[in-house]
């Protein structure tokens, strides 16, 4: 927890309009109303149990139903069994219920939920509803934007279910609390002259989990850089590093690459 405290105190001392499009976590802000976003996420992770790396691919479609509600569907692919194959999919929804706006800042809060289905074998104690586990999650997220800095934090409850024919091991805890802290700063441009300008954002995110049955936990740090092109295209590049863990995990450190394009006013 000392890592979170240091970074949080550092960020609230900054006084420097930032994007709230984080790489690893979702902010309280929503996708633009009437928009449809298409994203392809990829990760290349070090396999902790075998030689080589683990590759995950996740195509996603996001729909901004209105200014307060968005939904997303995802598919999960992995090279787990010596070849890229479909492992499952998921659905995500987020409802923004609080907005406080000022001249150079705003505050948002939202509730979110996720359901995932996965047919992979269960190899690890950590619960991952975006890659390895079936289950559901519900939580809250708050995001503060101050000038060029965005700070976002979330807390959620997750429960893992059986992965099709692979039953969740009884010796492992299947209930978890997830928590995140994300900080992003707009690095370029220093001053806007056109909405077509490429935005460059630097970010640092902390992602953690505690299994409620046994108290085991982990915390990862994820620095990243993001490019937003013509206000529609987005490229994210991130590196995840485990800070500590008392949980067995199949993959800890690795690289993430996400490509996204947003179509505006599709359903308005």
Question: Which residue ranges define each predicted feature?
Answer:
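Short glycine/proline- and aromatic-enriched beta-strand/turn motifs that initiate or cap beta-hairpins
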Residues: 19-62, 116-122
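Short loop/turn motifs that connect adjacent beta-strands in outer-membrane beta-barrel proteins
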Residues: 26-33, 68, 83, 99-108, ...
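Residues that define the transmembrane beta-barrel architecture of outer-membrane proteins
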Residues: 32, 53-57, 84-89, 105, ...
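Transmembrane beta-strands of outer-membrane beta-barrel pores
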Residues: 42-46, 75-79, 97, 113-119, ...
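Outer-membrane pore/translocation modules
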Residues: 82-176
């Amino acid at each position: 927890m000392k890592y979170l405290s240091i970074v949080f105190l550092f960020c609230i001392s900054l006084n420097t309009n930032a994007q709230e499009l984080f790489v690893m976590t979702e902010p309280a802000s929503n996708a633009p109303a009437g928009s449809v976003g298409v994203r392809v996420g990829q990760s290349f992770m070090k396999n902790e149990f075998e030689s080589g790396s683990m590759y995950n691919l996740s195509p996603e479609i996001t729909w901004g139903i209105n200014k307060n509600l968005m939904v997303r569907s995802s598919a999960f692919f992995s090279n787990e069994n010596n070849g890229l194959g479909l492992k499952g999919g998921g659905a995500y929804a987020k409802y923004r219920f609080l907005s406080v706006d000022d001249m150079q800042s705003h505050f948002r809060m939202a509730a979110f939920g996720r359901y995932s289905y996965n047919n992979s074998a269960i190899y690890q104690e950590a619960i991952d509803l975006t890659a390895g586990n079936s289950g559901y999650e519900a939580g809250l997220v708050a995001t503060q934007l101050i000038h060029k800095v965005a700070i976002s934090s979330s807390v959620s409850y997750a429960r893992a279910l059986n992965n099709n024919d692979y039953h969740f091991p009884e010796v492992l805890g299947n209930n978890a609390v997830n928590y995140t802290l994300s900080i992003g700063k707009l690095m370029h441009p220093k001053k806007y002259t056109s909405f077509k300008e490429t935005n460059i954002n630097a970010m640092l995110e902390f992602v953690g989990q505690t299994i409620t049955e046994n108290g085991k936990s982990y915390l990862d740090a994820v620095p990243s850089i993001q490019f937003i092109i013509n206000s529609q295209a987005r490229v994210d590049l991130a590196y995840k590093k485990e800070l500590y863990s008392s949980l067995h995990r199949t993959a800890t450190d690795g690289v993430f690459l996400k490509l996204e394009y947003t179509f505006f006013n599709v359903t308005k």
